[in-house]
């Protein structure tokens, strides 16, 4: 995990094996070049794990390969990709929670992820602890809180990306915030 690049390599095939390559300059390639860094950043902030974030980027663009051409408004590509990123991350979080509950997966050490974005050792420890607390939350609360407080999204954007009402997004964020404050004492 150490030092992995968040962007998929240039050799990543976005076309399934055996299918003809549509060639450079396709809508998918343009979307990938323009938005992969943003998708990767959002995926890492939500999931907190490099390996899962890398896989999620590939999943988002595989899904995009099937749907991008159907979008009527080219300006909507970014918003659509963000919504897909959030939805796929939500699914991964739900699966992860079940895997932990069933004993298939253990707890994760967030120290490395925390070190990459921290200014001080205290901040790193706090961030790693927040991710551990988030791991114990329902996916919808974790997702809404992460979008708001880790990604800095506006409440309206959180609601849109979580496919819920503004009131519901606020409630999920507040519930997560109370849990974090209860366990840490601040944040």
Language-model features and meaning:
Residues 8, 17-41, 51-54, 65, ...:
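A short, charge-rich alpha-helical start-of-domain segment used by transcription regulators
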Residues 8-14, 99-127, 131:
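Internal acidic/polar
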Residues 20-22, 61-77, 95-97:
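Sigma70-family region 2
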Residues 36, 40, 61, 138, ...:
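C-terminal flanking helix
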Residues 41, 55-62, 66, 75-87:
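Structural recognition of an alpha-helix C-terminal capping motif at a helix-to-coil junction
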Residues 69-72, 83-104, 123:
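Arg/Lys-rich amphipathic alpha helix in sigma70-family domain 2
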Residues 86, 90, 156, 162-187:
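DNA-recognition helix of helix-turn-helix
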Residues 144-148:
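A short pre-motif secondary-structure segment
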């Amino acid at each position: 995990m150490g030092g992995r690049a968040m962007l998929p390599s240039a050799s990543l095939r976005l076309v399934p094996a055996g299918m003809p390559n549509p060639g450079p300059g396709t809508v998918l390639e343009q979307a990938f070049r323009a938005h992969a860094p943003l998708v990767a950043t959002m995926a890492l902030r939500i999931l907190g794990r490099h390996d899962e974030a890398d896989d999620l980027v590939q999943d988002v663009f595989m899904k995009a390969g099937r749907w991008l051409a159907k979008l009527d408004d080219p300006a909507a590509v970014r918003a659509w990709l963000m919504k897909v990123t959030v939805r796929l991350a939500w699914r991964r979080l739900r699966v992860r929670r079940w895997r932990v509950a069933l004993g298939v997966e253990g707890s994760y050490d967030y120290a490395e992820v925390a070190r990459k974005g921290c200014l001080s050792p205290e901040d790193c420890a706090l961030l790693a602890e927040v991710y551990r607390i988030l791991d114990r939350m329902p996916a919808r609360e974790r997702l809404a809180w992460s979008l708001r407080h880790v990604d800095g999204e506006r409440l309206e954007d959180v609601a849109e990306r979580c496919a819920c009402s503004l009131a519901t997004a606020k409630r999920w964020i507040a519930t997560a915030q109370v849990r974090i404050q209860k366990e840490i004492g601040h944040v």
